[in-house]
């Protein structure tokens, strides 16, 4: 594909067979309404994502993993100000309470799921580097599984705007928010917010532009990656696939590419976790932004 907005991936609407089953199980196990951009890119490497997910699912559905995600979420607040009042800004732009509630539901779904994807991608990346992941001794309570399936009040599948088919205006917004983060493409979160172009424009220019890639932001992103690495070592089960096992499955070029993708998305999802929590803080305050919207 020659469209510059495209980055190789398998859309959650265009998969079938084993990959479709893998995507569905990721959503149900993590209790989230989307398959992360990173996972959609990992799906382009032959056989990798279904295998890696099978090796990881049991550890990621534990109460330990849920509490680890809660900790990462709480750590993601930037604690800087003054903050713009996003609710008042949306009112001024013509949004009513019902429309703002729809935006809120999307933000809360991503706030819940982003720290979980940070754990998953970190576990996959650490395992690829043949560093220790999982197998820790934890209490039976933390080893126990949480309910599988989407929590009450969560939409089962969020519609993501396809940047390659969007209007020129929306393509420009998606590129701007990606460039603001120094990213190679827009996160799923912003593809979902692109269903309301004015919302995406406001959060990009008025909420994120003042903070993205500042010293505080970059320090917080490093903190999240560091803590996620520590947390995946404590998982009660194994996760990911080591490079040595993949050498018989992938070509050297594929193996190198996979290593780079995992490294890149570990940092990508840390950034996005911070950004979406910051947007939510500007909408509903720090406590609402940093606590799980779907507690177990």
Curated annotation (Swiss-Prot):
Coiled coil: none
EC number in record: 3.8.1.10
Reactions catalysed: an (S)-2-haloacid + H2O = a (2R)-2-hydroxycarboxylate + a halide anion + H(+); an (R)-2-haloacid + H2O = a (2S)-2-hydroxycarboxylate + a halide anion + H(+)
GO molecular function annotation: (R)-2-haloacid dehalogenase activity; (S)-2-haloacid dehalogenase activity; 2-haloacid dehalogenase (configuration-inverting) activity
One Pfam family of this chain: DehI
Keyword Hydrolase appears in the UniProt entry: yes
Keyword Metal-binding: no
Keyword annotations of the record: Hydrolase, Plasmid
UniProt similarity note: Belongs to the HAD-like hydrolase superfamily. S-2-haloalkanoic acid dehalogenase family.
Function statement: Acts on 2-haloalkanoic acids whose carbon chain lengths are five or less.
Protein name as annotated: 2-haloacid dehalogenase, configuration-inverting
Gene expressing this chain: dhlC
